[in-house]
C-alpha cells in the first residue's frame, strides 16, 4: 500500500515518488537524446565519413565531459545526503564550491583539447579523412564544455533535492535550439554557413549554452536561495568545503574518465576494422542511446533517493527501493528492446537511407538489444552502490570490469577482427560482471554504516 506523501507502508519511497523524481530526468534525457539522433540523421545524409567523424568526436569529447559530470555526480550524492538530513543550508556552499571548480577545470580541458587533438588523434585513428573531420568537429565542440559543466552542477542540485521538473523544460528548449541550428549549420540553411560536421558541433555547443542560461534564470527566480545557503557565497570559497566535495567526487571523476576512455578505445579498435564497421557501430551507439537514457534516468533517480534514504537513517530500506526501481525500469525498457528485435530494418531506416548499411547493421541490433537488457540491472545496481556513498567500492568494481573489458577488446577485436555484431558482444560480458559484483557488494559490503 502506498501513501500520497511519497512513502509506502514500510516507510520507504513509493512508486509515485520514484516516478515524480525519475520521469522529469527521463524526459530531459529523451530530449537530449534527440540531439544525438538529429546529428546522426543529418550527418548520415552527408557522408559515412561525416557520420564516423561525429561518432569519434563525440566519444572523444565525452571522455573529457565525464570528468565534470563525474565530479557533479559526487556533489549530487552529498546534496542528497544533506537533503535527507534536512541540513538544507549546507547545500548551496556545496554547489558553489563545485561550480567554481568546474568552471576553471572546463577552461583547462578546452585548452588541452584544442592543442592536443591534432597531435593525438592521427596516432589512433587510421582513416585520414575521418581523422581530419574529427579534429574539425572538436574545434567547435570543445566550447560546449564550459556550458555543460555549469549545467551539470545545477542538475546535481535539483536531482539531489528531488525537484527535477526543471530538467524537462530546459531540455526541450535545448533540443529545439539544437535541431534548428543543426539544420541551418550543417546544410547552410536560414542564411547560415554550410559547415557540415563542424556545424553539428557548433549547434550542440550553442544549444548547451542556452540550456545553461535556463537553469540560471530558473534558480534565481524559483528557488529559496536563503533556505539552501546560496546567500553564503563567501563561506563557499572555504577550501574545506571543496575538499569535502572532492573526497566524494574525485573517485567518480576517475571512474567516469577511465570508463569512457575504455569506450573510446573500443571505438578506435572498431575503426581499425574499416569505415563501414565504424558506421555500423555508430548506428548501434545511437540506437542503444534510447534504452540507455531510459535506464540512466531510473538509475539516477534511484541513486538520489538512496542518498536521501541514507541521510534519513533508513539504510535498511535501500534494497526495498532498489527492487522497486528495477521493476519500474524493466517494465519501461523491455518493450522498446522487443520492438528493436522485431523491426530492425524499420528502426535503422530512421537514421540512414543506405540499404547496404541497413542490411549490415541488422545482426548488430540483436546483440545490442541483449546487452541493453542486461544493462538495466547493471546500471541501476552500480548507481545504487554509489548512492550509498560507497564510492571507492563502486570504483573498484568498475576498474575490475574495465580491465577485463580491455582484454576482451584487445584480443576479441584487434586480434580476431570480428564482425561489428560480434565486437559489440563484449558489452554483454561487461554488464554481466557488473551485475554480479554489485550484488555481492550490496549483500556483503559494509555500506550501511557509510558516513559522508
Where are these regions (language model features)?
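Alpha-helical transmembrane segments and their lipid-water interface positions
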Residues: 32, 36-39, 43, 65-72, ...
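Small-residue-rich hydrophobic transmembrane alpha-helices
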Residues: 51-114, 148-162, 166-167, 280-342, ...
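Short runs within selected transmembrane alpha-helices of multi-pass transporters and secretion channels
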Residues: 72, 76, 141-159, 167-178, ...
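Short alpha-helical transmembrane segments in multi-pass integral membrane proteins
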Residues: 1-22, 79-146, 192-249, 306-371, ...
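Interfacial/gating helices of multi-pass transporter permease domains
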Residues: 43-62, 94, 128-133, 197-198, ...
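N-terminal transmembrane alpha-helices
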Residues: 9-41, 45-46, 62-74, 78, ...
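Transmembrane helical elements of multi-pass membrane transporters/channels
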Residues: 20-39, 140, 174, 207-211, ...
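Helix-terminus/linker motif at the lipid-water interface of multi-pass membrane proteins
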Residues: 30-52, 121-128, 184-195, 257-290, ...
Amino acid at each position: 500500500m502506498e501513501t500520497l506523501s511519497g512513502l509506502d507502508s514500510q516507510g520507504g519511497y513509493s512508486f509515485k515518488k520514484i516516478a515524480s523524481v525519475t520521469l522529469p530526468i527521463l524526459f530531459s534525457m529523451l530530449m537530449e537524446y534527440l540531439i544525438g539522433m538529429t546529428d546522426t540523421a543529418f550527418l548520415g545524409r552527408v557522408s559515412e565519413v561525416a557520420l564516423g567523424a561525429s561518432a569519434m568526436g563525440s566519444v572523444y569529447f565525452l571522455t573529457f565531459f565525464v570528468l565534470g559530470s563525474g565530479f557533479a555526480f559526487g556533489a549530487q550524492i552529498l546534496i542528497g545526503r544533506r537533503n535527507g538530513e534536512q541540513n538544507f543550508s549546507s547545500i548551496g556552499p556545496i554547489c558553489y564550491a563545485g561550480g567554481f571548480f568546474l568552471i576553471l577545470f572546463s577552461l583547462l580541458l578546452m585548452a588541452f583539447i584544442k592543442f592536443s587533438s591534432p597531435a593525438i588523434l592521427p596516432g589512433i585513428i587510421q582513416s585520414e579523412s575521418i581523422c581530419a573531420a574529427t579534429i574539425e568537429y572538436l574545434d567547435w565542440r570543445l566550447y560546449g564544455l564550459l556550458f555543460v559543466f555549469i549545467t551539470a552542477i545545477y542538475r546535481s542540485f535539483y536531482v539531489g533535492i528531488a525537484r527535477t521538473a526543471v530538467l524537462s523544460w530546459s531540455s526541450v528548449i535545448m533540443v529545439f535550439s539544437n535541431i534548428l541550428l543543426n539544420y541551418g549549420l550543417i546544410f547552410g540553411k536560414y542564411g547560415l554557413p554550410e559547415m557540415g560536421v563542424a556545424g553539428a558541433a557548433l549547434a550542440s555547443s550553442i544549444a548547451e549554452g542556452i540550456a545553461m542560461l535556463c537553469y540560471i534564470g530558473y534558480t534565481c527566480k524559483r528557488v529559496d536561495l536563503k533556505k539552501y545557503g546560496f546567500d553564503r557565497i563567501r563561506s563557499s570559497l572555504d577550501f574545506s568545503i571543496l575538499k569535502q566535495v572532492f573526497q566524494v567526487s574525485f573517485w567518480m571523476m576517475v571512474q567516469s574518465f577511465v570508463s569512457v576512455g575504455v569506450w573510446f578505445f573500443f571505438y578506435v579498435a572498431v575503426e581499425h576494422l574499416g569505415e563501414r564497421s565504424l558506421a555500423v557501430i555508430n548506428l548501434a551507439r545511437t540506437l542503444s542511446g534510447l534504452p540507455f537514457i531510459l535506464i540512466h534516468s531510473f538509475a539516477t533517480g534511484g541513486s538520489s533517493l538512496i542518498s536521501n534514504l541514507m541521510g534519513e537513517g533508513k539504510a535498511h530500506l535501500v534494497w526495498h527501493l532498489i527492487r522497486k526501481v528495477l521493476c519500474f525500469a524493466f517494465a519501461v525498457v523491455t518493450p522498446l528492446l522487443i520492438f528493436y528485435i522485431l523491426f530492425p530494418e524499420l528502426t535503422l531506416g530512421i537514421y540512414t537511407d543506405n540499404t547496404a548499411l541497413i542490411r549490415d547493421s541488422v545482426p548488430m541490433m540483436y546483440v545490442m538489444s541483449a546487452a541493453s537488457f542486461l544493462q538495466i540491472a547493471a546500471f541501476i545496481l552500480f548507481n545504487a552502490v554509489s548512492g550509498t556513498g560507497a564510492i571507492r567500492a563502486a570504483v573498484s568494481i568498475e576498474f575490475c570490469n574495465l580491465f577485463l573489458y580491455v582484454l576482451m577488446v584487445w584480443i576479441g577485436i584487434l586480434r580476431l577482427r570480428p564482425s561489428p555484431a560480434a565486437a559489440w558482444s563484449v558489452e554483454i560480458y561487461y554488464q554481466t560482471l557488473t551485475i554480479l559484483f554489485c550484488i555481492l557488494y550490496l549483500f556483503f559490503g559494509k555500506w550501511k554504516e557509510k558516513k559522508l
